[in-house]
A protein has these predicted regions:
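Short, structured beta-strand/loop micro-motifs enriched in basic residues and often containing a Trp
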Residues: 37-45
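Short, surface-exposed secondary-structure boundary micro-motifs
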Residues: 9, 30, 64-65
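C-terminal structural segments of small proteins and small subunits
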Residues: 60, 66-96, 100, 105
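Short aromatic-glycine-enriched beta-strand elements
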Residues: 19-27
Length: 105
């Protein structure tokens, strides 16, 4: 699962019958460094959205086979799925010491 920011919507002229009544949004993923800065920096992607994410919303999304999991046992043509709307993202930097223990900075 990754975190991204919605930057727009997609309008379809035709859609698979099993996908009617839902939206598609354009999202830009965050790298860890971008999360610290609050600016997305990944490549735009189209995400299936049944939660109503709007422009500027931060979302968590799954991709690939996991994106279709919420519809099981139905088969849906989905490659990226908006799993939740995020109110806040807090990045706490952690490092692993030589002996494998995690420390916070």
């Amino acid at each position: 699962m990754r975190i991204g920011e919605v930057i727009g919507t997609v309008t379809l002229s035709r859609v698979h019958p099993s996908m009617t009544g839902f939206r598609w949004v354009i999202a830009v993923p965050f790298s860890l460094a971008a999360l610290r800065e609050g600016k997305p920096d990944g490549e735009d992607l189209v995400v299936f959205d049944s939660l109503g994410a709007g422009a500027g919303s931060k979302i968590a999304f799954s991709e690939g086979g996991e994106a279709a999991a919420p519809f099981h046992p139905e088969r849906k043509p989905v490659d990226a799925y908006c799993a939740c709307l995020l109110d806040q993202v807090v990045v706490t930097e952690q490092r692993t010491t030589d002996n494998g223990q995690r420390t916070k900075r």
